[in-house]
Each structure stands twice: as structure tokens, then as C-alpha cells.
């Protein structure tokens, strides 16, 4: 299973029909396939090894796809053209109306779909997207072509709060969650110290009674 990247996106367009198209796709089959579709030939080929008997045919299909689309399979296409390997959608959290656009909240596999944002931006969409991947400790803000990316591995909660933009930090509770982890870790270390002290005291008492 992949690490999941949390995303919060505001998306706007001057054409209301394009906004409705986003809503329908996001709440339905998937947003990225609607606007940046994976060619059918790439979707119908295995991204990986195949049985020996099928290798020759598989290689021919891969070469055809590479020459035609620039990619041999759906996985390579999605990672490069979308920025993530799977499509994104509501998954129980439908698009919300905001003045002039929509607010989208979703998880994406391993990374935010910034490559897709670039293509949507070229179609006339205005996009401000915040993302947060706790497993690899990175977060950022993609704002109409500019990507402010932050890595916070090894930082304290205080350092994170000082480094990340306030809106980004508060949107996902990043420094707050790290502060909770720090408090839990400190409590565990304190309990270990108490146990060790208790063990030493018991040993000393036994020695004195001999």
C-alpha cells in the first residue's frame, strides 16, 4: 500500500461549465481521467512482468505504446502526467461550493498530483492546492504554477510552526500532531526512568537486607 498524501484544493474557472465538469468528475469516476485521460492502449497492458509465453507479445505492445504515447504502460503515464499513480475523487467527501469555484479534499498515492495541476492550469483553471504527506514528512502549497515545498523530517513542533506557512500548518494540524507525538514520547521516557529507578531501589534494598 502507498503512503497517502492529504490534499486540500481550491479550483476556479471563468466558465461555469468547466466547474460543473470538475464537480461531476470528482464526485463520480475520477477527476484526472476526465481531463487528462490515460490512453486505452496504456490501460490495457500490464505494468510489470508477464508469463514467459506472453513476453514477446508484451514487448511488442510496449514498443508500440512507447512510440505512440511516449510511455509503455498506464503506471508510467500516470506518475509523469498526473504526478500520482491513481486517480483522485470524492471517496465520500464530495466537492464543496465556494465563491466562484470548488473546494476539493482528497488523498493521493505517494504525492500530490502537481503535474495534473500544471495541465489544468493550462486549460484555464486557477488552482491553489495544499498538500501534506506525514509518512515522508513533507508538505507544500501549489499556487497557480508555483510550488512551495517543505521537508520537516527531524524538526521539532516549534521549528515546524516557525517554518511552514501558518495556513498550511493549520490546515492539516502538522505542528500540533508532532507536538502530541513529542508529549507522548516524553511521557514514555519518563515512565521508563521511573521503572529503572524503582528497579535500582529494589536491588539496593535487597542488598541492605543481606
Language model feature labels by segment:
Residues 1-209:
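Long, contiguous binding/interaction regions
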Amino acid at each position: 500500500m502507498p503512503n497517502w498524501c492529504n490534499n486540500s484544493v481550491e479550483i476556479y474557472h471563468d466558465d461555469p461549465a468547466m466547474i460543473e465538469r470538475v464537480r461531476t468528475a470528482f464526485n463520480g469516476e475520477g477527476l484526472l481521467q476526465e481531463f487528462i485521460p490515460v490512453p486505452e492502449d496504456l490501460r490495457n497492458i500490464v505494468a510489470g512482468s508477464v508469463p514467459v509465453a506472453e513476453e514477446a507479445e508484451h514487448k511488442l505492445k510496449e514498443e508500440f505504446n512507447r512510440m505512440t504515447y511516449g510511455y509503455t504502460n498506464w503506471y508510467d503515464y500516470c506518475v509523469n502526467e498526473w504526478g500520482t499513480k491513481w486517480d483522485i475523487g470524492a471517496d465520500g467527501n464530495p466537492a464543496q461550493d465556494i465563491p466562484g469555484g470548488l473546494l476539493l479534499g482528497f488523498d493521493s498515492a505517494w504525492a500530490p498530483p502537481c503535474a495534473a495541476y500544471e495541465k489544468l492550469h493550462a486549460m484555464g483553471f486557477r488552482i491553489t492546492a495544499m498538500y501534506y504527506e506525514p509518512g515522508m514528512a513533507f508538505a507544500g502549497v501549489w499556487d497557480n504554477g508555483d510550488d512551495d515545498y517543505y521537508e520537516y523530517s527531524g524538526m521539532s513542533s516549534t521549528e515546524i510552526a516557525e517554518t511552514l506557512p501558518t495556513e498550511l500548518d493549520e490546515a492539516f494540524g502538522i505542528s500540533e500532531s508532532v507536538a502530541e507525538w513529542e508529549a507522548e514520547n516524553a511521557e514514555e521516557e519518563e515512565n521508563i526512568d521511573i521503572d529503572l529507578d524503582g528497579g535500582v531501589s529494589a536491588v539496593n534494598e535487597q542488598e541492605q537486607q543481606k
